[in-house]
Amino acid sequence: MSEVFDLTCDLISRPSVTPEDAGCQAMIAARLERVGFTCEHLHYGSVANLWATHGQGAPVLVLLGHTDVVPPGPIEAWTSDPFIPQRREGKLYGRGAADMKGSVAAFVIAAERFLVAHAGHPGTLAILLTSDEEGQAIDGVRKVAETLRQRGQGIDWCLTGEPSSSKRLGDLLRVGRRGSLSATLHVKGVQGHVAYPHQARNPIHLAVPALAALTARHWDDGDESFPSTSLQISNIHAGTGANNVIPGALEVAFNLRYNPHWSAPRLESEIVALLDQHGLDYTLHWHRSGEPFYTPEGKLRRIAREVLERFSGAPPEESTGGGTSDARFIAPLGAQCIEIGPVNASIHQVDEHVCLADLEALPDLYQLLIERLLADH
């Protein structure tokens, strides 16, 4: 087929279920070194990270991606083996085809082609890959960003290859993301027989008014760039499984997706104050996944918009929706961040796939972005 097809197939065939890399980064580094990149392997715990750079000085453009994939689930549910790439009816099937080994392959091909034409380009072209995006995201880009900060490494622009397109390649330009804050609430009660409630304290009954207040809370109205903040309860667990036992404890997990009107500490303070109004005996454990970020109108967005319109035939929607991405760790370094990638309709699903026409177009799209940002600088 083509270079990008062959490289994507090679990556898919490596079962890099998070946090495994399965040799993806070593293979990519060998290719990049052949065209003049300096490659540094940063291993933290069981996580592999690759920091590859070409050129020097500003401006610094980072192509950000991940080599890990989510587990495929039951193999028998797939039409073909998720780690044996298969071409069918104009699509390439396999775990990671869309999220995001196709984009990683396109990054590599685009960088190689760019350097053939612009070996002495201004500034720095960097590629940052991790095997910890789909997992805990602790020893991946989060840790690499800390290392880069300590070194004083500046980053001007970051292009993440997450599958951001909705219906067709290039129809959506991600220009920011909401923050994500998770919590696990433990409410203590007193276990007892359901026939003798006066001898027990039912933590479910005690917590219901507080949970109702949490879910009814109107956090904000959002703005022209971000939707309103949302709180969703994701898990509730209590009881022994028997229907005649009042549980002694309740565990509730919830998550907030929040816009820049809030910070994680402010949200935590608000929720603690609300819970304290209900007299619960509780503990609360927080996990901050990342603060919101936003790339304002400027050179990066303008060029990305022009390039996407050229490839998709219409101006892209500019959005801050969706989940989180590793760009949340790069933005605090002062970088303007955007996300452009293939259609996301099949990601994390059985029979994940990428349209072959989109896969073939991705290297050209990324190469044009690199040229507009660095070669035309």
Swiss-Prot record:
Pathway in which this enzyme or protein is active: Amino-acid biosynthesis; L-lysine biosynthesis via DAP pathway; LL-2,6-diaminopimelate from (S)-tetrahydrodipicolinate (succinylase route): step 3/3
Source species of the chain: Xylella fastidiosa (strain 9a5c)
Family in the record: Belongs to the peptidase M20A family. DapE subfamily.
Cofactors that this protein relies on: Zn(2+); Co(2+)
Binding site for Zn(2+) 2: D99, E134, H348
UniProt name for this protein: Succinyl-diaminopimelate desuccinylase
Residue stretches in coiled coil: none
Subunit structure: Homodimer.
GO BP annotations listed: diaminopimelate biosynthetic process; L-arginine biosynthetic process; lysine biosynthetic process via diaminopimelate
The protein's Enzyme Commission number: 3.5.1.18
Any one GO MF annotation of this record: succinyl-diaminopimelate desuccinylase activity
Function noted in UniProt: Catalyzes the hydrolysis of N-succinyl-L,L-diaminopimelic acid (SDAP), forming succinate and LL-2,6-diaminopimelate (DAP), an intermediate involved in the bacterial biosynthesis of lysine and meso-diaminopimelic acid, an essential component of bacterial cell walls.
List of residues binding Zn(2+) 1: H66, D99, E162
Xref: InterPro entries: ArgE/DapE_CS (IPR001261), Bact_exopeptidase_dim_dom (IPR036264), DapE_proteobac (IPR005941), Peptidase_M20 (IPR002933), Peptidase_M20_dimer (IPR011650), Peptidase_M20A (IPR050072)
Catalytic activity: N-succinyl-(2S,6S)-2,6-diaminopimelate + H2O = (2S,6S)-2,6-diaminopimelate + succinate
Catalytic residues identified in the record: D68, E133 (proton acceptor)
Pfam families documented for this protein: M20_dimer, Peptidase_M20
Annotated cofactor note: Binds 2 Zn(2+) or Co(2+) ions per subunit.
Keywords in alphabetical order: Amino-acid biosynthesis, Cobalt, Diaminopimelate biosynthesis, Hydrolase, Lysine biosynthesis, Metal-binding, Zinc
NCBIfam families assigned: dapE_proteo (TIGR01246), PRK13009.1 (NF009557)
